[in-house]
C-alpha cells in the first residue's frame, strides 16, 4: 500500500503544473487570467485547492512500514502496519480523484475558450459537453466546492462508462 501511495504523487504534481499553466496568462497562450473575463479571481481557487490537497497527500505518503512492531512471536513485523497503510492509500486515492475532477473542470472550461474547440475529437467534445450544466453556474451563486463536487460526480460516471466499454472490448478479443 505504501508503494501505491508513492506511485500516485508524481502524476498529481503534473496535474498541478498543468492547471497552473492554464490559469497563468503568461503561460496559457491567450486565455484570460484565471479563465475569467472579469476583474475577478476566476478559477484561481482551483489551483489553491489542488495545492492544498497535494500538501495533505505529502503528509500521507510517509510510509507506514517505516516503523515495525514485531508480532506473532517475532514471525510477523509489517502486518501490523498494513491497516494504516491501507487507510492512508484510500484517502490518497480519494484526494487524487478530487484533484482529477478539478483538472477536468479547469481544462474543459479552458478548451471551450479556444477557437479550435470545434475541431477536437468527438470524445473530447463529449467529455467537455458533460460539464456544460456546471459551466452555466460557474461564476454565479454556486461555490467552487459545489462545482468541484459536480465535476467529480460526472468524472466518476464517465470513468465507469469507459471501464464498462473497455471490459466489453476485452471480451471480444
Regions from the language model: what does each represent?
Residues 1-173:
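C-terminal auxiliary extensions adjacent to catalytic cores
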